[in-house]
Structures are given as structure tokens and as C-alpha cells.
């Protein structure tokens, strides 16, 4: 739980500070390996950078790279703070007398920091590439134009379907749990359910009694069933459309 809380706390902060990260990245790349006065300064200071990026690239550009930034913060700070929290809760940072040991505390912090940085480094690179992308007139540093899959590739459809499969499972599992229970509940002589009055009642009872996690019971099995089903459905649908449009042009 320490890992989860630490990661979520860092993500919450990242939502508000990511625009500053975009500005910082652009300013750090400006004039890379060039002597002062030999290059055009697109960003004179922090405030000018905010205005310039918002005006030329659009306000949405100030949140560029937000997805990898959130993942980076969740992994790095979740591992860093979570590991340190576990060490503290386990009593590894204190002496036999109960006082804080500075050496152990520093060692635990360093180890947690190294682990977080090592795992977060690839994501930080992706974040930097995205945040550096800008319109030609205010571009600084090397401009990456990543394209993992070629257009119209079956891999694009497969990757998109995998992501949408996760979204479908997250959205539908509570209703799947409730429908399973509604169909399985005992009934009286008139066929009326003895445990739930209907869909809403089943949702409320499950949430009150079993909590939010009760609404997601069997989510792993749901994904292994619904995930491949969604993936294959969208994949075949995309391929059939490509074949159809190819031969009807």
C-alpha cells in the first residue's frame, strides 16, 4: 500500500507541475552545444516560455508528455518513497534504542532512489522526447518523430485493441459481476429474486457490503476472456475493412 499511495501522491503533483517540466525541458535544450549569442533564443525566461509555447504550439502543448510523466512519477516515487517507507516501518532505520540511525537512513534513501531512477529512466527518455517536440519556429534540440508502427499496419490495430480491452474490462466488470449475481440468485415461487430487487440494488448492496474491490471480483479472468475477445474482434474488424475498401475502390 505504501507503493500505491506514494505513486498516486506523485501523480497528483505531476498534474500541476508538468507544464513547468515542459518549459524546463525546452529551456535546457535551447542553445545546446552552442556559444552564447550564436543562436536564436526562443525562450527568454520561464514566463516568456509559457506564453510562447501556449501561443505557437497551443495550450495543450504545456501538458505534452503527461502520460509518460505520470507513469514515471508513479514508478520512480512509488518505488523510492514506498521502499523507504517499508524500511522505516520494518524498523531497519533505527538503532536498538529506538533512535534514528543516520547512516542506515541515508543508505536506505540512496538504495530506494537508485531503484526508482533505474526503472524510471526509459520512461523519462520518452517524456523528454515528447516534451521537446515543438513547431518549427520555436523548436529546440533534436526533434524526434517517433512512429512505432507503419500506417495501416495490423500491429496498430492490435496495440489499440489491447489498450481498449483494458478500458472495456475496467468499465464493464462491475456490471458483469452484478449480472452474474442477478442470474444466479435464488427466486421465490413467482420467480422474484430473493437477494436483489434489480440492477441498481445489486450494485449498491455489493458496494456497501464488499467495497469497491468487490465490484471488480474476477477482473483478471474477465480480461483474459474479454481482453482477447475485444482484441481479436477489433483486429478482425479492422482487417476486414481494409480488405473491403481495397477491393471496392
Swiss-Prot record:
Solcar repeats lie at residues 1-90, 152-243. PANTHER family: RE38146P, SOLUTE CARRIER FAMILY 25 MEMBER 35. It is found in: Mitochondrion inner membrane. This is Solute carrier family 25 member 35. It comes from Bos taurus (Bovine). The lineage of its organism: Eukaryota, Metazoa, Chordata, Craniata, Vertebrata. Belongs to the mitochondrial carrier (TC 2.A.29) family. It is a multi-pass membrane protein. Disulfide bonds: none annotated.
